Amino acid sequence: MALQGSLSELSLPDVIQMVSVSGKTGVFEVSRSDEVGKIFLKDGQVVDALVGALHGDHAVYEMAIWSEGDFSFIPGEETDNVTIHLSNANLMMEAARRLDEWRVLSRKIPSLDLVPFFTSRDQSDQVTLSPHEWILVTRIDDEHTIEDIADTLHWS
């Protein structure tokens, strides 16, 4: 079963779900602009993925938020790497959750190429941060873009 299409027509989680139900082994090649990623299935189970410097489930989550680009499924191509140990259902649920989260964020942040910076505030203002938020704040340096920071923290 050769399958190909556009991510603007079908989301990657939906396409993976369709192919995985058939129990196929092969690879999804996913591309947009100058980025290319791969998601490997063995007997219908997602076992490995890579895009850029990301591997495993983080690579799947990154590609799942792509709304533009193309995909093709090449049956029979295998990998010896097993970097994903989640069930397809859990992997796709997390991908869908991140996609929903991304849709909300993308309305508030017009571009990942923006460089965040601190503004001066009255020192009497008290700010309370969670450990997760504190890690993020420590990466803001007036030089790196939102995308750079997300990549550094593996939050993309």
Task: State the predicted function of each range.
Residues 1-156:
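Acidic, Ser/Thr/Pro-enriched low-complexity segments and adjacent helix/loop capping patches
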